[in-house]
Amino acid sequence: MASSTSNSAAARMQTHLQTEPQNRSQNQLQGSVTITQSQTHTSAPVLRLRGESTGESESSTNGERGLGRGRRIQWAEDVVDNEGLGRKKSKVCCIYHAPRPIDESSDESSSDSDDSSSDDDGGAKPSGGNGDKHDHGDECAHGHAHGKGKGKGKERKRSPNAYERQPNYKGKDKGKGGG
């Protein structure tokens, strides 16, 4: 009923504006007073994110019952405890190689005694010599220190990594006090 009353009031105002034009500036002022109201109020759509359906949440009437029950994180069978600390992680700090018998041959040799051609395997090593101090076992040969001492007696000079290296500006005298 209220919407029909406001619609008829708007119609009367428009009729009043059309039948009684006074001067041009007041007519424009009164012409801008026309109000249109709509009574439809729509709520914003709500997006509900749900994991895989387990049957109990599908059978619920409002879709929210049963969402929190029975859900827990489960590690996949191939996720390993890569640091030997009893914690499984999906983010690994090195590539895990399953232990294999000593007499089993492989295409890749991971022992340092077989690699006599180079002192360095190309991997990045932290400065200071003590490294990350985490234990991977005897089979771990992936290029970062484990805090077990100096290792080989002859080490090559450490080169700076990308964050420590100073950029080389060619053609610009940035470091000189010229002008």
UniProtKB/Swiss-Prot annotation:
Major localization class: nucleus
Compositionally biased region (Basic and acidic residues): 131-142, 170-179
Location(s) in or outside the cell: Nucleus
Region (Disordered): 1-179
GO molecular function terms noted in the UniProt entry: protein phosphatase 1 binding; protein serine/threonine phosphatase inhibitor activity
Source domain of life: Eukaryota
Cellular-component GO terms for this entry: nucleus
Bias (Basic residues): 143-159
The keyword Nucleus belongs to this UniProt entry's keyword annotation: yes
Residue stretches of biased makeup (Polar residues): 1-43
This protein's UniProt keywords: Nucleus
Entry keyword annotation includes Nucleus: yes
Pfam families listed in its UniProt record: PPI_Ypi1 (PF07491)
Compositionally skewed regions (Low complexity) per UniProt: 52-64
Biased composition range(s): Acidic residues: 104-121
Family: Belongs to the YPI1 family.
Function recorded in the entry: Regulator of type 1 phosphatases which maintains protein phosphatase activity under strict control.
Protein name (Swiss-Prot/TrEMBL): Type 1 phosphatases regulator ypi1
Species for this entry: Sclerotinia sclerotiorum (strain ATCC 18683 / 1980 / Ss-1)
